[in-house]
């Protein structure tokens, strides 16, 4: 398993800077997920690690060894793409063993390696079929099997589930997690889907405009986002953000005035390093699942339900709000959607405070 380190990595395409100083360490055996919107640099970063691109600046090390000048074939890694890239005229077994054949491995050894990988992926019965006889999920398993047979120290996945329907994506997420548990090999996975990131990763790397916004476990990113971008990107539906102003400053705390809440202000803890003064604008964030219908909570806000979304085990209520634009609340369980105006309670410990530049203050 490879321990991957990136130090000061910059990548330019002409005058465009796709990656702007990436410092990152990925422990051996970890399942690391790069997540972010389209164009954030996550696939470019994966291509640099793979060796398909060369950094404009900075270094990439595998187990302490500088990879500059080392071609992809010399990095002991395997890559799985969004496209399955299977040879249509070959059987599943021949597709999986093709790289081993090109490397000169004897046929008897190839057969053993392919059989082991097929057993792990539960596709032994498919080994004699052609790709056209397989479903999308089966083709993706073959593509993953083609990577497994090479016994790499590092797996790279570039949005491998994007071509699958919703049900198959859920199934393949489970299979990838189980594969990592069995192999304990380093894996780096690129996706724009934060659900994939949250369910698969040991550590998530959130990228935006060529920069790393935050690195942490799924729970750390969800419960303690370091800025507004991460707060909005991680979690679905996105975090509710209420605009307010600093009404008073206390030792280790801040009193925030927010129009439309009762009482009219909310006192929250403040980071010692935060530099604020009375009158400054701030935003208070609350996750939809942290809002409670009823009169409880440190403060309350009234909302008129505009529409509801029933998703089986829960219901999402949406309502316009003068400061948030729209408030969303998650109601667990099956119940009839409330109509008219309802009251929501907000607890202090559920709140996140952000400066107007997006950085976390609480």
Summary of predicted features, one role per range:
Residues 5, 25, 61, 343-345:
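ABC ATPase nucleotide-binding domain
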Residues 56-59, 109, 209, 243:
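Conserved coupling/switch loops of ABC nucleotide-binding domains, chiefly the family-specific signature
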Residues 72-229:
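ABC ATPase nucleotide-binding domains
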Residues 237, 248-362:
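Non-catalytic connector elements of ABC transporters
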Residues 35-37:
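The feature captures the beta-strand-to-loop junction immediately N-terminal to the Walker
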């Amino acid at each position: 398993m490879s321990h991957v380190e990136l130090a000061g990595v910059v990548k330019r395409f002409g005058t465009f800077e796709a990656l702007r100083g990436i410092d990152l360490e990925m422990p051996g055996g970890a399942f690391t997920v790069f997540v972010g919107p389209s164009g954030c640099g996550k696939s470019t970063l994966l291509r640099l690690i793979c060796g398909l691109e060369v950094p404009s600046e900075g270094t990439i090390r595998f187990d302490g060894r500088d990879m500059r000048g080392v071609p992809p074939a010399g990095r002991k890694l395997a890559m799985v793409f969004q496209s399955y890239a299977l040879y249509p005229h070959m059987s599943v077994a021949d597709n999986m063993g093709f790289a081993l054949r090109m490397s000169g491995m004897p046929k008897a050894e190839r057969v053993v390696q392919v059989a082991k990988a097929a057993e792990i992926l539960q596709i032994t019965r498919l080994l004699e079929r052609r790709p056209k006889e397989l479903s999308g999920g089966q083709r993706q398993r073959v593509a993953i099997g083609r990577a497994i047979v090479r016994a790499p120290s590092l797996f790279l996945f570039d949005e491998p589930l994007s071509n699958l329907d919703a049900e198959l994506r859920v199934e393949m997420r489970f299979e990838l997690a189980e594969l990592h548990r069995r192999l304990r090999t380093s894996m780096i996975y690129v996706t724009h889907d934060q659900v994939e990131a949250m369910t698969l990763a040991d550590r998530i790397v959130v990228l935006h405009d060529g920069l790393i916004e935050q690195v942490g476990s799924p729970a750390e990113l969800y419960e303690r986002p370091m800025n507004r971008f991460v707060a909005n990107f991680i979690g679905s539906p996105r975090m509710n953000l209420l605009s307010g102003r600093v009404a008073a400053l206390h030792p280790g705390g801040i009193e925030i005035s927010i129009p439309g809440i009762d009482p009219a202000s909310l006192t929250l803890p403040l980071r010692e390093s935060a530099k604020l003064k009375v009158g400054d604008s701030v935003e208070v964030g609350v996750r939809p699942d942290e809002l409670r219908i009823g009169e409880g909570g440190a403060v309350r806000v009234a909302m008129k339900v505009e529409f509801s979304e029933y998703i089986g085990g829960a219901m999402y209520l949406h309502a316009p709000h003068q400061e948030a634009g729209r408030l969303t609340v998650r109601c667990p369980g099956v119940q009839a959607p409330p109509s008219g105006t309802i009251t929501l309670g907000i607890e202090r410990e559920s709140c996140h405070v952000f400066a107007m530049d997006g950085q976390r203050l609480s």
